[in-house]
Amino acid sequence: MVTQAATRPSNDAGQDGVTEPDILAVARQQVLERGEGLNQEQVLQVLQLSEDRLEELLVLAHDVRMRWCGPEVEVEGIISLKTGGCPEDCHFCSQSGLFSSPVRSAWLDIPSLVEAAKQTAKSGATEFCIVAAVRGPDARLLSQVAAGIEAIRNEVEINVACSLGMLTAEQVEQLAAMGVHRYNHNLETARSYFTNVVTTHTWEERWQTLTMVRDAGMEVCCGGILGMGETLEQRAEFAANLAELDPDEVPLNFLNPRPGTPFGDLEVLPAGEALKAVGAFRLALPRTMLRFAGGREITLGDLGAKRGILGGINAVIVGNYLTTLGRPAEADLELLEDLQMPLKALNASL
């Protein structure tokens, strides 16, 4: 017998009162019980839920995360090895050399890189990501990365990740040989919306880098930014794109409009809409590490951070981001302690 709780009137129901299964009831069976992620059409239904069902969604997303990922939260810190001067035109990014942004090109020295890794490890983090604002690494950058990784390994017990743009097959092998644990390269948005965000390279070029990274044995980190003008349909498409890729980690960023960039005048995503996206992406990716990344402070604030961690998130970036300020590491760690969520241990990350 179908109960009233399991069905709701369809938005497309005709005068005959046709009903369809409630999407959250479907998700409980499909995702929570069987561990099968929602498809694109189903994710769209979740994104279209009314605001009065947000808490119900977040509770379900948290239950899914606890069942299929467990209670541990992975903590990561990031550092910019090479800041600014990027030749690409990613419309959200203040590090592009094509825009009138206040960010200027600069390199970080190896001792500063090691010190940042030490401070990251002291926070309880197990992952330290070295980032460079480039289309892809040249010989000089790869040499700096190699020296930095070696210096960090000699002094700090932490996994090292990298985010260096698009790679050649040879560069992928070089990074794997350096011992890079995880490689980040975000698809940023749905395939159908990508040309509204970037025009100097293609979505397919990014995808190719990610598949080569996986084939080389490194973990794949791939997410994007929500709130760049995409429709709910495209947001659902993006979740499906990520599910097809099946990365080890998905960082969810929320647009923090930067002065001087083409997206500098966009509105910040409403908190409820951002949290609904968090829950929807968890239901699409039940077994994937889902990380709170940039923009959550301006979009969600302190209360939103708690609701997100109780709504499907199981990883965080602590401290500052590349060109914007983040929450203090102590604030996130205190929140996790209050919620009695253990930090992922280093040996569990290897």
From Swiss-Prot:
Its annotated function is as follows: Catalyzes the conversion of dethiobiotin (DTB) to biotin by the insertion of a sulfur atom into dethiobiotin via a radical-based mechanism.
Q: Which cofactor does it need?
A: [4Fe-4S] cluster; [2Fe-2S] cluster
Gene this protein is translated from: bioB
Which EC number applies? Answer: 2.8.1.6
Q: Which reaction does it catalyse?
A: (4R,5S)-dethiobiotin + (sulfur carrier)-SH + 2 reduced [2Fe-2S]-[ferredoxin] + 2 S-adenosyl-L-methionine = (sulfur carrier)-H + biotin + 2 5'-deoxyadenosine + 2 L-methionine + 2 oxidized [2Fe-2S]-[ferredoxin]
Report whether Metal-binding shows up as a keyword of the record: yes
| PROSITE patterns in the cross-refs | RADICAL_SAM
Region (Disordered) residue ranges read 1-20
The record's comment on protein family reads: Belongs to the radical SAM superfamily. Biotin synthase family.
Disulphide bonds in the chain: none
Q: Bias regions of kind Polar residues — which residues?
A: 1-13
Tell me the ranges covered by the Radical SAM core domain, including all copies.
71-296
Q: Which GO terms describe its molecular function?
A: 2 iron, 2 sulfur cluster binding; 4 iron, 4 sulfur cluster binding; biotin synthase activity; iron ion binding
- Keywords assigned by UniProt? 2Fe-2S, 4Fe-4S, Biotin biosynthesis, Iron, Iron-sulfur, Metal-binding, S-adenosyl-L-methionine, Transferase
Q: What does the cofactor section's free text say about binding?
A: Binds 1 [4Fe-4S] cluster. The cluster is coordinated with 3 cysteines and an exchangeable S-adenosyl-L-methionine. Binds 1 [2Fe-2S] cluster. The cluster is coordinated with 3 cysteines and 1 arginine.
Q: Return one Gene Ontology term, BP aspect.
A: biotin biosynthetic process
Please identify the protein, giving its name as recorded. Biotin synthase
Q: Where does [4Fe-4S] cluster bind?
A: 86, 90, 93
Question: Pathway it acts in?
Answer: Cofactor biosynthesis; biotin biosynthesis; biotin from 7,8-diaminononanoate: step 2/2
In which residues is [2Fe-2S] cluster bound? 129, 162, 221, 291
